[in-house]
Amino acid sequence: MVRLPYVTALTTLFSYGLLFAFGQLRDFFRRILDAGKSSNLKGYAPICLGLEDFYTRRLYLRIQDCFGRPIASAPDAWFDVVERYSNDSNKTLHRTTKTSKCLNLGSYNYLGFAAADEYCTPRVIESLKKYSASTCSVRVDGGNTKLHVELEELVARFVGKPAAILFGMGYVTNSAIIPALVGKGGLIISDSLNHNSIVNGARGSGATVRVFQHNNPAHLEEVLREQIAGGQPRTHRPWKKIIVIVEGIYSMEGELCKLPEVIAVCKKYKAYTYLDEAHSIGAVGKTGRGVCELLGVDPADVDIMMGTFTKSFGSCGGYIAASKEIIDHLKHICPAHIYATSMSPPAVQQVISAIKVILGEDGSNRGAKKLAQIRENSNFFRSELQKMGFEVLGDNDSPVMPIMLYNPAKIPAFSRECLRQHVAVVTVAFPATPLLLARARICISASHSREDLIKGLEVISKVGDLVGIKYFPVEHEKTASVEKLKKLQ
């Protein structure tokens, strides 16, 4: 829950108002100066229109260097960030030959599989030699290798479902699967903070879409009751099917889904449950099986389980796990399965090897150690940030921890200063978040050592003081006083 301080809200609104006013003034003078110039686009409607275009030109370009920074190494605990410069006020960014070695607090490398691994990497290289980088075909033609079949069986066993289906891209897994599951005459009830892939999938399905308050099962029940009572628009016939969509860990909030309560509501009103575990599978739970394991939920109670291989497994692609009937149905009608090139064989092998490490089937206990390490690292880092006075969103055990920035001027200030001190962080602003709720999103990895985390905390604390984002310093001062008293005693 975001606790936006009143003064911070006012200063943030004032800052955006100032940027908007100066941007409009610059646009006014530009129109005057360009009035006499000829244009070869006369008569064409402008491609970019509205406030989105204005935001891009007058706000985003000012801080463009804080986003999309190229890297020149594997996204391990430390990586090389390519230095860039601009000679035209950030309109164009040029790469240099220089790199800066930085602590990586931005990648989704939760279990550390993104870098070279003693078990995974040799097998990936061998699969590259045997199968090449691409199948150059779709699954229903010549793109179905035995690796794909093995991974589908392994994923189903890992998450506790009868069957699974693979996709070459995590985003497409949601945006293509949802329209294949529900269409006209159906009802989708979605959490208000669900990922954009879910939003686009729901919009493209043709189903009626309703939203419930973030992570609020009570409001979910209200929406369900209201929609069931009213039925379909205009005809008021009963809904053909109802699907409730939630995430395991919300990627911009770091919060765990209230899954047991959501399932109880869905069972009560005979609605299907769709769980997106992109950020939770492999990252939470004693054996890495996601929020179901962490919260004590039987996977059989979740109708459709979605996940990606881009976070905990160091690869690409995604999966859907469900009953055999649902998976067979998807294999026959889902365009992303029928028409898209199958997942790259080396990427498939990477996931197979990573899951075997997690399960201990590589003959070691490295998987268990990684899971214990990510949990310990996440809880330590979150606790220390809160003690320092930062406003940190999310729950314990979650490796995603947003630090609230709010003010637009603090987005580039925080990002650039952290980079200058060799700590790479991800800053997130509109449209990925609401306009007033800009944040820095920290992602913790099992590959981070305690020394790495302390280094990151020291830099973030210094930059936080410099930028002024310790919005709850009283808590920090109280904690410091208690610790000082304990030491004296």
Curated annotation (Swiss-Prot):
Transmembrane segments: 4-24
Its job: Serine palmitoyltransferase (SPT). The heterodimer formed with LCB1 constitutes the catalytic core.
Cystines in this chain: none
Example GO biological process: ceramide biosynthetic process
Subcellular localization: Endoplasmic reticulum membrane
Catalytic reactions of this protein: L-serine + hexadecanoyl-CoA + H(+) = 3-oxosphinganine + CO2 + CoA
InterPro entries: Aminotrans_II_pyridoxalP_BS (IPR001917), Aminotransferase_I/II_large (IPR004839), AON_synthase_class-II (IPR050087), PyrdxlP-dep_Trfase (IPR015424), PyrdxlP-dep_Trfase_major (IPR015421), PyrdxlP-dep_Trfase_small (IPR015422)
Keywords, sorted A to Z: Acyltransferase, Endoplasmic reticulum, Lipid metabolism, Membrane, Pyridoxal phosphate, Sphingolipid metabolism, Transferase, Transmembrane, Transmembrane helix
Membrane-topology descriptor: Single-pass membrane protein
N6-(pyridoxal phosphate)lysine PTM positions: K311
E.C. no: 2.3.1.50
Pathway the protein acts in: Lipid metabolism; sphingolipid metabolism
Cofactor(s) needed: pyridoxal 5'-phosphate
Name the UniProt record assigns to this protein: Long chain base biosynthesis protein 2d
GO molecular function: pyridoxal phosphate binding; serine C-palmitoyltransferase activity
